[in-house]
Design a protein with these regions (language model features):
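Hydrophobic small-molecule pocket/channel-lining residues, especially in calycin-type beta-barrels
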Residues: 25-182
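Hydrophobic core
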Residues: 18-26
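Bacterial N-terminal signal peptides that target proteins for export
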Residues: 2-17
Length: 182
């Protein structure tokens, strides 16, 4: 029976009630149960020490920029938003992959730099690395390693290094101390 063209004996109110009841039954039957929250494992929380609004200082104590790291996607990823005093801006997306059991970071900046790092927590430090072409000579393969280490005072040290001899020696590209912004 077409309820919208129901005989007058049912009346329009009865027809609309029947349509509403039918829609509610279909809707109630098709609603999936709320899924368990993803990304709640201990491993997913390993990089949370980096979350916050930071002022970043170089080794000599001079402020070199600001960084905001926030949890996104219901806590499944970290979004980094860097603003350097030299005009460099960049963002990274960081996520723990439960399949390969490693952390992944994809960094892009306004200079066209793309870094795709992979790593894990080593002791208390997050260590990510990549092997790829040298920024100064694309014909030469280099290793890059970035280590984030939380300190007892709540600050975080970020050390970015490069090796062109398969990890025998390392050159520091960036050494920053993150202090929570006030």
């Amino acid at each position: 029976m077409n309820f919208l063209r129901a005989p007058r004996r049912f009346g329009r109110l009865a027809a609309l009630s029947a349509v509403s009841l039918s829609a509610a039954c279909v809707s109630a039957q098709s609603l999936p149960e709320a899924p368990a929250k993803a990304c709640q494992s201990v491993e997913h929380r390993q990089f949370d020490f980096w979350v916050g609004h930071w002022e970043v200082f170089g080794p000599a104590g001079k402020k070199v920029g600001e960084n905001r790291i926030e949890l996104i996607a219901d806590g499944c990823a970290l979004l980094e938003q860097w603003t350097g005093h030299g005009g460099v801006t960049g963002k990274s997306l960081n996520i723990y992959d439960a399949v390969d059991r490693r952390w992944h970071q994809t960094w892009v900046d306004n200079g066209g730099t793309l870094l795709m790092l992979v790593g894990r927590l080593v002791d208390r430090s997050m260590v990510m690395s990549l092997t790829g072409p040298s920024p100064s000579d694309p014909k030469v393969a280099v290793q890059q390693r970035i280590t984030w280490t939380p300190a007892a005072d709540g600050s975080v040290r970020q050390l970015w290094e490069l090796s062109s001899d398969a990890g025998t020696t390392w050159t520091v590209l960036f050494d920053g101390r993150y202090v929570r912004a006030r």
